Amino acid sequence: MKISIITATWNSGATLRDTMESVLSQTYPDIEHIIVDGGSLDNTMEIVRELEPQYHGRLRYVSEQDKGLYDAMNKGLKMATGDIVGILNSDDFYTNEKVLEKVSKALDNKIIDAV
């Protein structure tokens, strides 16, 4: 079961590295991370490009003006190819490396329907 994580950004250079590294640290193997940037004026996209090689093809991103957070999230949803879609804000991060693995198992075992 593939998991798509969508992160909308705008001038998130101060926090995005922690967000991306928390996705990279996940033990669940079938993840794509989609970053939709609203045309940041800071170093947001430099961080994305710097960390891109560590994703080994599992990172997709776009940087262009949008109409705000929900427009960015909708763009991310259109780009997503996962069976499960999650939202991770650009100033949030997963507190441990097994979060997505646990979510996947809970959904597979019908313990939960949504998170």
Model-identified regions with their sequence ranges:
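Acidic helix N-cap motif at the loop->helix transition within catalytic regions
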Residues: 14-17, 42-51
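Conserved donor NDP-sugar-binding/catalytic core segment of glycosyltransferases
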Residues: 97-115
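Catalytic phosphate/metal-binding cores of nucleic-acid and nucleotide-processing enzymes, i.e., regions
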Residues: 61
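N-proximal low-complexity "stem/linker" segments adjacent to membrane-targeting elements
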Residues: 1-25
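Glycine-rich, basic loop-to-helix element that forms the pyrophosphate-binding segment
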Residues: 64-80
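A conserved acidic beta->alpha catalytic loop
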Residues: 29, 37-46, 89
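Short aromatic/hydrophobic "clamp" motif used to bind/position activated sugar donors
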Residues: 85
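Acidic metal-phosphate-binding loop of nucleotide-sugar-dependent transferases
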Residues: 67, 92-94
